[in-house]
């Protein structure tokens, strides 16, 4: 429980640091703000801006078997939603199942789906002082992110049709031995790739 909450908290700090202050208010989705078709799912939270709705919900749309195959326990799911007047993030965090004695106690993973665009995410990450490596994943623009002020953590932001999917992972050490920065992100791209494959299927059937 501690690792999951810590992972979610640290990711939220990193994501929200580059965003303007807000009232943290949300529109109640019991009354949809705009008419929707019978095939459109209204997000659990919506904001008051004219941004796109957050279509992909990590808490609802990532199958348990995908999380398990990636090395995370779906039973440890913990909500990490955030709604402001001007943007929305839907997400959850999970405890990892991989344990390497003397090296890795476990991983903590957070997945947030947001409706600010890729360039806003890039600017936010730069403003946070992140070390950014632009890359691509499954044909999508992506950013690999580390930050010396958040040791043993690694992030990846992937462009979506409505905004970005933001991943944050923390390596909880199983000893006091330091972990070289070059190893902070080992294996994260594989995890992200598995979930982005789910996103690909979701977006292809939602058009």
Regions found by a protein language model. Give the residues of each.
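C-terminal motif of bacterial Sec signal peptides marking the signal peptidase cleavage site
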Residues: 15-18
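Bacterial N-terminal signal peptides that target proteins for export
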Residues: 1-9
């Amino acid at each position: 429980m501690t690792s999951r909450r810590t992972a979610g908290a640290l990711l939220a700090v990193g994501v929200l640091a580059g965003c303007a202050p807000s009232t943290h208010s949300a529109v109640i989705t019991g009354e949809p703000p705009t008419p929707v078709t019978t095939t459109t799912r209204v997000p659990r939270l919506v904001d008051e801006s004219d941004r796109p709705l957050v279509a992909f919900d990590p808490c609802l749309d990532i199958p348990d078997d995908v999380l398990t195959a990636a090395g995370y326990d779906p039973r440890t799911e913990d909500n990490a939603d955030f709604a402001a007047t001007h943007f929305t993030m839907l997400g959850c965090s999970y405890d990892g199942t991989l344990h390497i004695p003397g090296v890795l106690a476990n991983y903590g993973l957070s997945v947030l789906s947001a409706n600010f665009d890729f360039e806003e995410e890039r600017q936010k990450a730069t403003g946070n002082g992140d070390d950014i490596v632009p890359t691509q994943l499954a044909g999508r623009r992506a950013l690999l992110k580390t930050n010396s002020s958040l040791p043993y953590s690694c992030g990846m932001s992937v462009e979506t049709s409505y905004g970005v999917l933001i991943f944050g992972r923390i390596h909880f050490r199983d000893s006091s031995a330091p972990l070289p920065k070059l190893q902070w992100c080992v294996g994260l791209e594989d995890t992200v790739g598995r979930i982005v494959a789910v996103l690909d299927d979701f977006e292809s059937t939602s058009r």
